[in-house]
C-alpha cells in the first residue's frame, strides 16, 4: 500500500486534486514561498477553508484577490488568526537549520494577537466540545489528548508543553552528582 506523505509539494498536489478540505498556514506564506506560486494559489481555491495564522494579512490570506483572480468565483472561506511576534511570547523555536532556541516573552503583545499555543488550545477545546455534543467520529484521540498538561490554569504553558515533550522527573533525582528537581 502506498503511504501518504506530507511534504510541501505533495500537500499542494492533493489540494489541486480536491483531496483536502482545509489548510492551516501557520506562520508561513505558501502563496508566494513555494516552488510554484501560481499552483499554490490555485490549490488554495479548491479548499473549503484556509486558516491563516500570522502577524499580518499576507498573500496567502488574501490569495483570493490576487492577480487574475475573481473573488466571486472562489468559495474558500479564509480565517485570519492574528498571532504574536516571536519576542512577545515564551517558547521554543526550531528551524530547518536544525538549531533550537528557548525564548522568554519580551514586550506585551499587541492588540488582540495571541501566542500560537493559546490559539491551538482554544481550537482544541472548541473541537472537543463539538465532538462531545455531536458524537464525533473516532473520538478517542480527540477526547483523550491530554491538553490539560499543556496548560497552566486556563492558558497555554510553553514550559509545561516542553516537559510533556521532553520528559521530567516526578521526584528529586541525583545523577552523576547533579541534583535534578
Region spans (language model):
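Non-catalytic alpha/beta scaffold blocks inside enzyme catalytic domains
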Residues: 1-166, 171
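Non-catalytic, alpha-helical, charged scaffold/linker segments
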Residues: 146, 173-175, 179-181
Amino acid at each position: 500500500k502506498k503511504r501518504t506523505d506530507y511534504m510541501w509539494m505533495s500537500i499542494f498536489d492533493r489540494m489541486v486534486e480536491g483531496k483536502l478540505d482545509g489548510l492551516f498556514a501557520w506562520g508561513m506564506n505558501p502563496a508566494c514561498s513555494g516552488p510554484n506560486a501560481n499552483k499554490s494559489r490555485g490549490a488554495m481555491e479548491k479548499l473549503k477553508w484556509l486558516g491563516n495564522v500570522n502577524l499580518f494579512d499576507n498573500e496567502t490570506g488574501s490569495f483570493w484577490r490576487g492577480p487574475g483572480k475573481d473573488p466571486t468565483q472562489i468559495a474558500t472561506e479564509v480565517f485570519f488568526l492574528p498571532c504574536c511576534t516571536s519576542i512577545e511570547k515564551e517558547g521554543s523555536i526550531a528551524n530547518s537549520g536544525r538549531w533550537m532556541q528557548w525564548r522568554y516573552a519580551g514586550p506585551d503583545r499587541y492588540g488582540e494577537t495571541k501566542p500560537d499555543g493559546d490559539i491551538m488550545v482554544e481550537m482544541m477545546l472548541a473541537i472537543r466540545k463539538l465532538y462531545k455534543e455531536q458524537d464525533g467520529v473516532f473520538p478517542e484521540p480527540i477526547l483523550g489528548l491530554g491538553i490539560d498538561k499543556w496548560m497552566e490554569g486556563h492558558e497555554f504553558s510553553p514550559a509545561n508543553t516542553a516537559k510533556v515533550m521532553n520528559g521530567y522527573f516526578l521526584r528529586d533525582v541525583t545523577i552523576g552528582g547533579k541534583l535534578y528537581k
